UniProtKB/Swiss-Prot annotation:
Positions annotated to bind 5-methyltetrahydropteroyltri-L-glutamate: 18-21, 114, 567, 611
Entry binding sites for L-methionine: 437-439, 490, 605
Cofactor: Zn(2+)
Class in the EC hierarchy, top level: transferase
Pathway in which this enzyme or protein is active: Amino-acid biosynthesis; L-methionine biosynthesis via de novo pathway; L-methionine from L-homocysteine (MetE route): step 1/1
GO terms assigned for molecular function: 5-methyltetrahydropteroyltriglutamate-homocysteine S-methyltransferase activity; zinc ion binding
Functional summary from the UniProt entry: Catalyzes the transfer of a methyl group from 5-methyltetrahydrofolate to homocysteine resulting in methionine formation.
Protein's name in the database: 5-methyltetrahydropteroyltriglutamate--homocysteine methyltransferase
Gene name for this UniProt entry: metE
Keywords annotated in UniProt: Amino-acid biosynthesis, Metal-binding, Methionine biosynthesis, Methyltransferase, Repeat, Transferase, Zinc
PANTHER family: 5-METHYLTETRAHYDROPTEROYLTRIGLUTAMATE--HOMOCYSTEINE METHYLTRANSFERASE
Length: 765
């Protein structure tokens, strides 16, 4: 019997109940030792491997585990340690590893940014003066562990050298190939050790291949993989791409490797078309990513099987590997942890474990015939049909509103230059007004009280009284700090997207649908399963209460449509732009309710706008136009003297600055401190006419910045931005920080602001 091969590309690290997160945080807090951390994480790792083994996955990834991030792991493997961490050679300690990611008092953390167009963050390699040496072969360690403990012949996973270097900073185009030449021998050393240990397959991830780049760069891949092939001829290398199609399909599939991994889900149909046009080398394996590794909806297995049957016309079945489109890092572990979900929605879901089941079903169908999995196919067919046809998915009123969008105003009544005068008149703020981004620390008491409320251990009245008490306490703290524009603190919210999902029709929260965002930070994206509709006021009560406590303006705080889309698991049966407009119409009603109730500064956060950009620049225009439209749909109906703010996270902005301006927000705040001034250079080169706050300190590190550091950041920004346009704020929300460090950092921020403000006022006189 000719057998197709089942494979996985990576498995979630978090654990079914976030055990990985808790272990890390216990270690950071000093409540467990390093040995205990290693033991706890090993147990989690082996449990994940055993599940994949029991499900019948043929090629099980090893080395996809990390204590923080796989890109940081690669840096540490090769000794790419920034000098400020004073590493003196040899294996990198776990404490140094975490210091690079999180910072310490005398050394700022390395920059963190989004992994391609996902909500996962990686630690950016600092490549200046890089001199790679293999310090620790993690891939070999995890391979030997899986073999010894479980008898698994695992498939080690590496971040490929070109992708790794492209993700780094501190090198330039002229020196790239010189730098690459330094890394090739270090990678070969890893591969030689793997080959010697008896490894059959190794997966080398090169998602850079799925981006847009100049064709001449293909020569770099030819050079690297030819070097690998010559050094380890007995090792089967799977060159793995994902998140998009290949611009240079014909060249990539002819690279000197044993297998090419291609995304057949997020490729807009390009991959199958390329296969039909150019064929596929008969001596290679095609690893077909046909199960969506980035969303949670059950696959239409009939359609997937038809796709694989098409592919099998060009690739022999024994050379066909069935796998997810990308690592399952981006989805929760198992839907079996969600017994309380509505059965129609639950039936339509597929988390990591269920996706592995789907892969095994499809592989068996290819090998043994459709009849061998007839029962499983029928079950999937029925579940998808029931969800698609259910009232859960279809709201006729919402569909009518979407059809009527041409009659809805999406522009502010006055242009910015006119309405900002009206806003200044009543706000009466000083030069360099100060604010924060939205959330304040959620202490153990906040989390425990919310948990008690959710369990029914305290009444609604008791919970609301606690939230009001915490809100009042932080309004007072902000006034004592002398912050100009206040926030209510968001103590009622677990997450800036999940909270809205709990209040809007068409959303469903999960209990354990957690995915890793960065480090130990996990998010629980809501499920957008149906048409989205406004059903009740979402933020009005808390905002109005906070405003009643102070004469200073308090910002209403909402999350914008594209961020809600990008940070949710969105239904896959209608275009995302339609869902974004449904969200925009619902939030428009919330914005109007805030304004009606006296909230005249409203922040509509769009932190994920750039991360959702398609990897192919040719697809940008539609995405950005859709994003601007849904944002303006949310905000355009307010009065001219109501000030609209927005906030954006880790991003490169130089190529979307026109889009940012087109959002027509009166004030934008941007996360900038970890990029060490790179974003500021964007504003040195363009004229931005609206008001702007560039984050003056990094909130992702527990380190408290000095007044001098903050002043340096302010002054650097003021070289590019007119003082009258400039706001001062932290990089991002402060929910994950501890209270003492938060207050200390804000004190430094206000002190720094007042000193710089005084300097400018003297200059003006």
């Amino acid at each position: 019997m000719v057998k197709a091969i089942s494979s996985n590309l990576g498995y979630p690290r978090l654990g079914e109940k976030r055990e990985w997160k808790r272990a890390l945080e216990k270690f950071w807090n000093g409540t467990i030792t390093e040995e205990e951390l290693l033991a706890e994480t090993k147990a989690l790792r082996l449990h994940a491997l055993k599940k994949q083994q029991e499900k019948g996955i043929d090629l099980i990834p090893v080395g996809d585990f990390s204590f923080y991030d796989q890109v940081l792991d690669t840096s540490v493997t090769f000794g790419i340690i920034p000098k400020r961490f004073q590493h003196e050679g040899g294996n990198v300690s776990l404490n140094t590893y975490f210091d690079i990611a999180r910072g310490k008092n005398d050394a700022v953390a390395s920059e963190m940014t989004k992994w391609f167009n996902t909500n996962y963050h990686y630690i950016v390699p600092e490549l200046a003066d890089a001199n790679p040496k293999l310090l620790n072969n993690r891939a070999l360690y995890y391979y030997e562990e899986a073999k010894k403990e479980l008898g698994i012949e695992g498939k080690p996973v590496l971040v490929g050298p070109i992708t790794y270097l492209k993700l780094g900073k501190g090198s330039n185009a002229e020196s790239f190939e010189v730098l690459l030449d330094k890394f090739i021998p270090a990678y070969i050393e890893i591969l030689e050790e793997l080959e010697t240990a008896g490894v059959e397959w190794v997966q080398i991830d090169e998602p850079y291949l799925a981006t847009s780049f100049e064709k001449k760069e293909i020569a770099l891949f030819e050079k690297v993989y030819q070097s690998f092939q010559e050094a380890v001829p007995n090792l089967k290398i799977e060159l793995q791409t994902y998140f998009e199609s290949l611009d240079y399909y014909e060249e990539v599939v002819n690279l000197p490797v044993a297998a090419i991994g291609i995304d057949f889900v997020h490729d807009h149909g390009d991959s199958l078309q390329a296969l039909k046009t150019y064929g596929f080398p008969q001596d290679k394996y095609l690893a077909a990513g046909v199960i969506d590794g980035r969303n949670v909806w059950r696959s239409n297995l009939d359609a997937k099987l038809a796709l694989l049957t098409d592919i099998a016309h060009y690739v022999a079945k024994d050379k066909l590997i069935v796998q997810p489109s990308n690592s399952l890092l981006h989805v929760p572990v198992t839907k079996l942890s969600e017994p309380d979900l509505d059965e129609v929605i639950l039936g339509g879901l597929s988390f990591a474990d269920q996706k592995l089941d789907e892969i095994v079903i499809l592989t068996k169908a290819l090998t043994e015939g459709v009849e061998s999995v007839a029962k499983e196919l029928e079950e999937a067919r029925k579940a998808v049909k029931v969800l698609n046809e259910s009232s859960h998915r279809n709201n006729l009123e919402v569909q009518a509103a979407i059809a009527n969008l041409k009659n809805v105003r999406v522009d502010r009544e006055l242009v910015f230059a006119e309405r900002i005068k009206l806003q200044h008149a009543w706000l009466n703020l000083p030069l360099f007004p100060t604010t924060t981004i939205g959330s304040f620390p959620q202490s153990p008491e906040v989390r425990k009280t919310r948990a008690d409320w959710l369990k029914g251990n305290i009444t609604d009245a008791e919970y609301n009284a606690f939230i009001e008490k915490e809100t009042a306490r932080w309004i007072k703290i902000q006034e004592e700090l002398d912050i100009d524009v206040l926030v209510h603190g968001e103590f009622e919210r677990t997450d800036m997207v999940e909270y809205f999902g709990q209040k809007l029709a068409g959303f469903q929260a999960t209990k354990f649908g957690w995915v890793q965002s960065y480090g130990s930070r996990a998010v629980r994206p809501p499920l957008i399963y149906g048409d989205v509709a406004f059903t009740e006021e979402i933020t009005v009560k808390e905002s109005v209460y906070a405003q009643s406590l102070t004469k200073r303006p308090v910002k209403g705080m909402l999350t914008a449509p594209v961020t809600i889309i990008n940070w949710s698991f969105v239904r896959d049966d209608v275009p995302e732009s339609v869902v974004a407009n449904q969200v925009g119409l619902a939030l428009r009603k919330e914005v109007e309710a805030l304004e009606r109730n006296g909230i005249k500064v409203i922040q509509v956060d769009e932190p994920a706008l750039r991360e959702g950009l398609p990897l192919k620049q040719a697809r940008w225009e539609k995405y950005l136009n859709d994003a601007v439209y849904s944002f303006k749909l949310t905000t355009a109906s307010v009065q001219n003297d109501t000030q609209i703010h927005t906030h954006m996270c880790y991003s490169d902005f130089d190529d979307i600055i026109d889009t940012i301006s087109a959002l027509d927000a009166d004030v934008i705040s941007i996360e900038t401190s970890r990029s060490h001034g790179e974003i500021i250079s964007t504003f040195e080169e363009v004229t931005y006419d609206k008001e702007i706050g560039l984050g003056v300190y990094d909130i992702h590190s527990p380190r408290v910045p000095t007044v001098t550091e903050i002043q340096d950041n302010i002054r650097r920004a003021l070289r590019a931005i007119d003082a009258k346009q400039f706001w001062i704020n932290p990089d991002c929300g402060l929910k994950t920080r501890q209270e003492p460090e938060t207050i200390a950092a804000l004190q430094d921020m206000i002190k720094a602001t007042k000193e710089v403000r005084a300097e400018y006022q003297v200059l003006e006189k």
